[in-house]
Amino acid sequence: MSSRSLSAIVLLLGALVTACLASNGDRTQFFHNCRQNCERTNCSADGLEIQEQAVKFYQQSVFDRLFQWSCADECQYGCMWRTVFAFFERGWPIPQFYGKWPFLRLLGMQEPASVIFSCLNFVVHLRLLRKFRREVRPDSPCYMLTHIFAVTSLNGWIWSAIFHTRDFPLTELLDYAFAYSIILCSLYVMVMRMLHRYSLFLRGVITLAFLSYYINYFAYLSVGRFNYAFNMMVNVATGVIAAVGWFVWCHFVRTRRPYFRRILRFYILMALAMSLELLDFPPILWILDAHALWHLATIPLASLYYECVEILLYSNIATCVCILAS
């Protein structure tokens, strides 16, 4: 084996070791021993109750108890930070724990920035939906379709806030499943917009197909071990199909509908915002990570497409309200 090949292998192994250190904090013996000793010393047999001698040490707030921080959870949280500091002392990269970066807990919330931004997204969608209902007649084209997307979004943001508050298997499932429902609904709205002149029967069949697919996918996520990689691929593929569909639509109507530029702008900005999800860095001040920034970026995007709805209404082009529901 040549020295160049050997050097390449050494560099590759070094990169792999670094990657492991950066993502496997919960697999270190240090973390494992710390957690074992903590639970044996401070917790009840089931790991739920804090022993009397440790109550003053943990000093749980009303929010910690409300969000069900058990003694075992407190041990995991404390040992997580002890492990992080141990990595710091050795000059190693900040590790992840169970696939997540370490976050400072605030008022019982595991990821406070993502919770706040999810709630802000919910508030913005709710406020703009109410404004839409005041200004658009119920018999307007795509009135119901816009409501379907809005309600789907509101539900998704509720579960996003709940999941980032406390990460349980159930809250994780509902967050991922309902987040995908928003993306799938975007694709559904695009298809319905393309077929708005076709028969009600055809649109009904397609609606049932979308519903059946989503129920089946929800059931798939609910059974067995959660497949994060597959779920991400499905989300990206669905989003790309919806975006491509709108780009094709914009291309064909560019001479007849000048507002198509707003739709293009929305999807370009959405793509830029989604690129934040590709970044992966330790939380700034242990609170703000790339995922939280993605949630922050979607707040003005919601206002952007509802703003376009208002402009179209003032122009008496009611039929395109549904376009902005994606």
From Swiss-Prot:
Lumenal side: 23-105, 164-171, 225-232, 289-302
GO annotation (BP), single: GPI anchor biosynthetic process
Sample GO molecular function, one term: hydrolase activity, acting on ester bonds
Annotated TM spans: 106-126, 143-163, 172-192, 204-224, 233-253, 268-288, 303-325
Keywords: Glycoprotein, Golgi apparatus, GPI-anchor biosynthesis, Membrane, Signal, Transmembrane, Transmembrane helix
Pfam families registered for this protein in UniProt: Per1 (PF04080)
Main subcellular localisation: Golgi
Organism superkingdom: Eukaryota
Intracellular or extracellular location(s): Golgi apparatus membrane
Membrane topology, from the record: Multi-pass membrane protein
Signal peptide (UniProt feature, chain positions): 1-22
Residues listed as glycosylation sites in the UniProt record: N42
Family to which the UniProt record says this protein belongs: Belongs to the PGAP3 family.
Protein's name in the database: Post-GPI attachment to proteins factor 3
